[in-house]
Amino acid sequence: MADLTKLMKGPTEAEPVQEQPKLSREEYAAQKKAEREELWTRIDALTADVFKDGSSLRGFLDFTAQCSPERIENLLLFHSDAPEATWLKTFDEWKQAGRSVRGGEVGYTALIGQDYTREDGTAASGYYVGKKFDVSQTRGRQPNRAPVYAADELVTAVFTNSPVRLAVSEAVPEGIQAQYAAQNRTIYVRNNMDAQTTFLAIAREQAAASYDIHDGRFSRAAYSAQSYCAAYVAAKKYGLDVRSFSFDRVCQMCSGLEPQEQRRFLSDVKQAAYTVERTVRRGLNEMELSATPEPACSVEVHASMEQTERPARTKKASQPQRE
């Protein structure tokens, strides 16, 4: 028989779309678990890539200096997926910050922390796999480039706001620019070095001091590599010349570690670098505040003076009201 659809005057009815079967609670949980396991496998591979050679580690540390604070797993993911990113938030976080993500933008996979309540009513923290967007994917004026500071300004900043006591000393061992002494919680700094060498030495020792939990068991040697890398991140963050750094020995030291241990190393570097950066930033802010001249008098005082000096008005006689 002939095709009956040719006899139809109107448009043919579309074939019904088959709906995806809804997953049970157990199936959904299993699917999400598989997604997490796949992501962690990728994170392990990215971790190993960082320690492949000195150049790879340098590239990751450069990204750490460039990017806003993140958990180490996200830094590894973003370094691979969004190497130009500088500041990442979730869709809702950007909304809370007063910015909106442009339509059509695709987010980057990330582990996003969340608080939740267990079945027994106790509070707990966890994470879920979600998306974050870089500031370049949002509407609005893009952030200004960070100002560039001279090395001597950075030295002044760390002296101004150091969380650890700094002391200039000629008793520092030969060949050592600065040294953290755990017994009296002091960083001893050699005098009369150039500003860049001084800053790098202090940044390295401030990073080392951040690992000291003051239990009497601190070992400076145990954190030499982490402190070295953290000083690099801080120097890179503030635009100093970092060409003298070499990371081949660090990679050799970490190459035999398990991925979790390698990430712990990178996390230690990151946290120490953030500590040094906060110290420098606060010091620079204090320097800028102290350099800003105070106005001769405030607007409120001006207004008060004008009100005081203004001649008093004579009260007009009340006018008779019309009856």
Q: PLM ranges: what are they?
A:
Residues 2-323:
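N-terminal accessory/interface modules of nucleic-acid-binding and processing proteins
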